[in-house]
Curated annotation (Swiss-Prot), chains A, B, C, D:
Protein's recorded name: Chorismate synthase
Pfam family, one: Chorismate_synt
GO biological process: amino acid biosynthetic process; aromatic amino acid family biosynthetic process; chorismate biosynthetic process
Binding site for NADP(+): 47
Upper classification of the organism: Bacteria, Bacillati, Cyanobacteriota, Cyanophyceae, Synechococcales
UniProt keyword terms in alphabetical order: Amino-acid biosynthesis, Aromatic amino acid biosynthesis, FAD, Flavoprotein, FMN, Lyase, NADP
UniProt source species: Synechococcus sp. (strain CC9605)
Gene: aroC
Amino acid sequence: MGSSFGDLFRISTFGESHGGGVGVIVEGCPPRLNLSVESIQAELDRRKPGQSHITTPRKEADQVQVLSGLLDGETTLGTPIAMVVRNKDQRPGDYKDMAVAFRPSHADATYQAKYGIQARSGGGRASARETIGRVAAGAIAKQLLKQAAGTEILAWVKRIHNIEASGIDPQRVQLSDVEANIVRCPESAVAERMVERIEAIGREGDSCGGVIECVVRHPAVGLGMPVFDKLEADLAKAVMSLPATKGFEIGSGFDGTLLKGSEHNDAFLPSDDGRLKTATNNSGGIQGGISNGEPIVIRVAFKPTATIRKEQQTIDSDGKATTLAGKGRHDPCVLPRAVPMVEAMVALVLADHLLRQQGQCSLW
Amino acid sequence: MGSSFGDLFRISTFGESHGGGVGVIVEGCPPRLNLSVESIQAELDRRKPGQSHITTPRKEADQVQVLSGLLDGETTLGTPIAMVVRNKDQRPGDYKDMAVAFRPSHADATYQAKYGIQARSGGGRASARETIGRVAAGAIAKQLLKQAAGTEILAWVKRIHNIEASGIDPQRVQLSDVEANIVRCPESAVAERMVERIEAIGREGDSCGGVIECVVRHPAVGLGMPVFDKLEADLAKAVMSLPATKGFEIGSGFDGTLLKGSEHNDAFLPSDDGRLKTATNNSGGIQGGISNGEPIVIRVAFKPTATIRKEQQTIDSDGKATTLAGKGRHDPCVLPRAVPMVEAMVALVLADHLLRQQGQCSLW
Amino acid sequence: MGSSFGDLFRISTFGESHGGGVGVIVEGCPPRLNLSVESIQAELDRRKPGQSHITTPRKEADQVQVLSGLLDGETTLGTPIAMVVRNKDQRPGDYKDMAVAFRPSHADATYQAKYGIQARSGGGRASARETIGRVAAGAIAKQLLKQAAGTEILAWVKRIHNIEASGIDPQRVQLSDVEANIVRCPESAVAERMVERIEAIGREGDSCGGVIECVVRHPAVGLGMPVFDKLEADLAKAVMSLPATKGFEIGSGFDGTLLKGSEHNDAFLPSDDGRLKTATNNSGGIQGGISNGEPIVIRVAFKPTATIRKEQQTIDSDGKATTLAGKGRHDPCVLPRAVPMVEAMVALVLADHLLRQQGQCSLW
Amino acid sequence: MGSSFGDLFRISTFGESHGGGVGVIVEGCPPRLNLSVESIQAELDRRKPGQSHITTPRKEADQVQVLSGLLDGETTLGTPIAMVVRNKDQRPGDYKDMAVAFRPSHADATYQAKYGIQARSGGGRASARETIGRVAAGAIAKQLLKQAAGTEILAWVKRIHNIEASGIDPQRVQLSDVEANIVRCPESAVAERMVERIEAIGREGDSCGGVIECVVRHPAVGLGMPVFDKLEADLAKAVMSLPATKGFEIGSGFDGTLLKGSEHNDAFLPSDDGRLKTATNNSGGIQGGISNGEPIVIRVAFKPTATIRKEQQTIDSDGKATTLAGKGRHDPCVLPRAVPMVEAMVALVLADHLLRQQGQCSLW
């Protein structure tokens, strides 16, 4: 409860930021899938700290170890796939003050209120380190979707603070465009300005947020389980469960509410192959909670990192007023590292719904 | 799968727009709750069609019948509570053309693609009629939350098309303010302009959308189950499962991404009673996925109604190009009737998490 | 929680023995299944009280009404199928004393202890009346299994008190053999003695139990989800959730523990069609938690009916000693009516696992 | 799906018999439980191979490592507790023939039929080695039940082949009695004969089965969730998911069907403390699916070990007739090592239902 996600393609993550390690069990993966452990590691490398000067300087190898579920390390058995990443480079000293003073807008105070206890340092389960299990599992989901349906999932940074990339075409953008720079914005001129902004804000001891966009190209048609497990509903939950998220949009999103029905509706076009085809894609690839085969497009708002070096007002665990200045090594902006996290969560939703659709609607 | 929602306080809805009826089973409701069936009916009356001239003129009594789970019609037994509303006033003729031509941005085409079959008329499960079960169940959740924790849930229309109410204080607004006008916007001067806009757009045979805001006052502290069932994640899923939703925000939302961490963080204040208290509420009442006791504030984007009287390009079920003009009796704007739906979905999430928190964290 | 069963083919039952009605929602049924409502009613007729002089003389028509999920009353839409049976012929007076004195070995005392409240009469959810929803849903599962895989499910009474039928061949017995007599034992000579025994014990104001056997012929191969949702584990749970059950066996069962491995093992035989074939079937059609295609054979122990006319020692709800003699119209032996219940629960397990297998293992 | 068990206190196991290791994640454990890792290891030691001359001579240390969920290695955080045991002492050579010839009454053939692939050696997930995760998780459940409700769970061998212990009093038997001999039968004279029987049958290259009995003393009252998650139904599923089980009984079990209602009913006795008390315990501590506070007593049938040294008829993976004689190091009788497995599964069910009862019925 709470640390598991999905119904048929189901993952369970474990691990605190400091302790033996973090990891995940992937349950329900179809048997006889060719699985590349290198691809899993590659996704983890996109997520890991210390990958560039605009991320936290913490150095962690984040080497994944697959404990079960594979034959010869390359073919799924249909049994649970357990993956573990050992914790390294621990400096609990960094977090000493934090154990006493509650970090504003962080999870310290609420974990204490909920559980009456909490991990002594580093954010415990609320640390971004927890997302390792998600990214590793998401890498498997991606390979499943690719092999079963030719589906591609790609995310990128669309806005940092108030610097927005407006020329990206979700139909065409490639992984190499995204990975071409350290901020993961495929519009290179804008990316440069984003990096400068992150540097500047980081120098102030402050932080910033922004917006990540994600596209699913060639999704299977018919995914989504009305009325509660509509595809957009499960996507919303998936990304809103990532740390630091504040908003979710699909297709036309909040701006779409400014249009009239006649402007917003996506006219159906005749197609040669019987697939549904629409003139516009305000629906974002999902209608009535079910994928129609057009690209699925979502956007996710990430707030500025809560932990900053600037001194802030807060209280300590006795409820007394105090001040706090973060001493840990934190990202001034989480978005570059959050790109693979968003892709992973989207992949997990799609993989789960692929199997659910297969379960209910493929008998005849 | 798909028609059930919640873990411990769990609902399952059933019913097409045309057929024997629609309804819901509520499972897991605590025993010995004083339940007012009148309050359930009152919520359904806020949702029902024909309640004002800016909603669909369809007349449906939507009278709820409670089949099980109550002693003397007023106290819960702890067993499943089944509620049914019979379908009335059916005019399947209205939908005749729609069975052939797929309505743009509606669910006809995707239901057909997914299931290979669909209800012959009226939208089937994709009809807003399905939300009757949600609203009835939400009314029970509200009473549970009120009696167990003194929690209040209130939603209202914040924006219609581009007319926005900017002076509403989520801490103070009352149900009577919301119900004071037919558009359910508590700022009366703005409400008047909203009604005029809906009338004007309706006369054009077109439709419009907007934004609903919802507050939870006096939520229990500690609700939310990291890392996947964070409270905001479950809220996002809950409201994004409502028909016509395109976006979700909590607290500072998308706008919050324009702030720096030092501006966005909510400083903790010393409090007399040991409860957490923050100087600002950019977090929207949830930190680290767990409620901190401050008001929970969310916003939901609703697109313009898909079915309009204006003629539109589309295809028929054979894939041939055709045009379609909606002849049914539809809302030119769903928001006034969606207000109780949003409250219901929020109440269901809170009730479920209250029981989940009780289950895991109240033994000692 | 508690009133739902299954994962993909999932049912939720509701209703007390007295009140508005009882029923069930079936979620996840594949679309485009030809469904005969008459067949559902036929199963309910096998279950209903008053069907013969050895069952309770209560007369209830138990007429099922399908509220949703069907097109033209005969084809599934893939959406939830809700079925309701109205309660009739209520004589709450019969149960007056029982509201005060706890019936020994019945659920009165434990429901009160658990919930702190209970239905005022008739056993509430603990009544056999609750099984109506199971049998109706099971009838759908049977039709699904028949159409998808040619699977047949058949149960019968194997023992009443100490009168046992020993000549039944699970491979060959037919529904007509079972329905040939009122006790539902396909060995007619033994059946006669069983009826006499039930009559005799009933005349004493007492009751008796026995054993029901059930076979699944032509099950799909590969059903069952190790390691916890092994097919026999889910079958055990399914039938042990029926009222009055005390034991479950599969294949060789308890007697099989008296054999040595060399005697108990089922040798595999070469087969022409690639299907698995075994020389014996001590496994009862399931190996390693997975169906091997051989007939699945289980047995279920039912205790003597708890409510009897004979006076018994007990306590009242204040904890004071008292005596009680049942005045309601109860079955002296539940087994004849439990036969369709066992079939229904077995069908529900198989249908669910068929979809689960389809979901995980049919992509390529 | 399939490798997870429980709703609120939920475990997910992973790992093949050969590979990186086996383990479990325990989700939903209440925070602030004092947890002894030594006690977990002690339970694993009762389960491990090589513990006596009547078990398999494989030597495995089965040393548990706790990766997450604990503060200072002794207090639960309320977050997932991950535990891993590394695989050692692998001799895949032993299983070479088995990869080709299907072992009769083992899981080789059905895993192949279901998944189209299987672990190359040692039984994969079907190996008893998988139960390590269950026993480790069960040890946590035991500590939870003890601290929260004073509950004790104890199992023992009641019968081996046809040698039965008939003088054991479930109310009084102690762990030390069970652990006093290597066969884990608390009746020492009978135990001696059981050991001799196992030795004799083992010398023949054959195997034997038997019956394990288990008692829960001082269970919380009110556990169990009618109508499907009755406590006995979940217990049945729990133990029937263990390898080699063929039957389950509660209380009077199959023999109880030979009694009349007047003989079988458990008369309620007045009690001083308001707790329910019964004159007899044919119900086995559960009535209407809910614990009444009396000891819960169950029995489980285990078949003779499938893998034997004697030559047997079978087929190979091409469907051709062949013979097979087990060469691996296997237990001639699984029961001594299965005792802690039964206790673990029972503890997991009770812990889960304790939290579920707390969740629904403890708000007021």
